[in-house]
């Protein structure tokens, strides 16, 4: 792989808790400011726009590009799902049951958005028109966290406190699959081109591969304290992830080869991660910056 060039873009203040990031087809990066109570947009020309949210403490967290090409995001404290149009027009969809604390969100093969309810022990599904369905999980206190669309047509999710992953669809009941390590504390999840799922295990500092046959392979990182958090797949077969506890961005190939890239400033606290249409990797740093990683020719 070519050398990696890292560039940082200031988009917020440290006290605003920059958290999630997503790319839309127009090349823009959208991000959440969990304590700034706003959604931001970094345009391809470098301009930064902010869209304040109506709740005083909505806590926008995870964000994704929906099937309609627009950014969709969860508001954990406001108990809602939000959607923004390119011109900043906002729509909010409150969840049917209070204090569900939605967190992870991802587009599904069915043209809907699926989200995890941390405190509700449920997975939710919302159409682009705002119709919501909820599905109870068979595990209580599992802390459903992040979502990903699998190549098998199912939606997959992590259960942070249960040390497990699960699958679901609108017609298939939820199934739960324990991971190999009791202290895994899985957070991020992504699917590769071969149909395998890759899981960021924050608890034991490892990336796990869950293949189509249900086999689990664990790849320990350089430190158990690395606390891998979010993970995303690129078109070249690599999985990129944030190491919240180690101040790095990590990469693992489908063969299990690991690499890591140190961030410029100590204590950057990387959280969300996304791949843009050009194949560049973007991560959200709690210091109020987005960092872009792109391949550069060798010297």
Swiss-Prot record:
Q: Which domain of life is it from?
A: Bacteria
**Pfam families found in the cross-reference section:** Vgb_lyase (PF24684)
Question: Which SUPFAM superfamilies does the entry mention?
Answer: Calcium-dependent phosphotriesterase
Q: Does the keyword Magnesium apply?
A: yes
Q: Where does substrate bind?
A: 229
Subunit: Monomer.
What this protein is reported to do is described as: Inactivates the type B streptogramin antibiotics by linearizing the lactone ring at the ester linkage, generating a free phenylglycine carboxylate and converting the threonyl moiety into 2-amino-butenoic acid.
**HAMAP family membership:** VirginiamycinB_lyase
Family according to the record: Belongs to the Vgb family.
Can you say what this protein is called? Virginiamycin B lyase
Q: Which organism is it from?
A: Bordetella bronchiseptica (strain ATCC BAA-588 / NCTC 13252 / RB50) (Alcaligenes bronchisepticus)
């Amino acid at each position: 792989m070519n050398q990696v060039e890292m560039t940082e873009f200031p988009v917020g203040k440290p006290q605003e808790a920059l958290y999630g990031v997503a790319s839309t087809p127009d090349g823009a990066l959208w991000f959440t400011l969990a304590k700034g109570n706003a959604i931001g947009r970094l345009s391809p020309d470098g301009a930064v726009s902010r869209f304040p949210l109506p709740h005083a403490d909505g806590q926008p967290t995870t964000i994704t590009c929906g099937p309609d090409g627009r950014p969709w995001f969860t508001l954990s404290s406001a108990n809602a799902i939000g959607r923004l149009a390119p011109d900043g027009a906002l729509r909010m969809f409150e969840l049917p049951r209070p204090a569900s604390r939605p967190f992870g969100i991802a587009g599904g093969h069915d043209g809907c958005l699926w989200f995890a309810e941390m405190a509700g022990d449920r997975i939710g599904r919302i159409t682009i028109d705002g119709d919501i369905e909820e599905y109870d999980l068979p595990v209580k206190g599992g802390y459903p966290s992040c979502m990903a669309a699998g190549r098998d047509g199912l939606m997959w999710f992590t259960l942070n406190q249960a040390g497990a992953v699960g699958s679901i669809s609108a017609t298939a009941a939820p199934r739960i699959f324990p991971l190999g390590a009791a202290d895994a504390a899985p957070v991020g999840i992504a699917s590769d081109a071969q149909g395998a799922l890759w899981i960021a295990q924050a608890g034991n500092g490892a990336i796990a591969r869950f293949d189509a046959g249900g086999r689990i392979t664990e790849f320990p990182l350089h430190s158990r304290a690395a606390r891998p958090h979010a993970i995303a797949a690129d078109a070249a077969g690599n999985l990129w992830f944030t190491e919240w506890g180690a101040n790095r961005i990590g990469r693992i190939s489908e063969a299990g080869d690991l690499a890591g890239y140190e961030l410029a400033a100590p204590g950057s606290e990387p959280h969300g991660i996304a791949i843009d249409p050009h194949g560049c990797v973007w991560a959200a740093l709690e210091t109020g910056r987005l960092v872009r990683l792109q391949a550069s020719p060798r010297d």
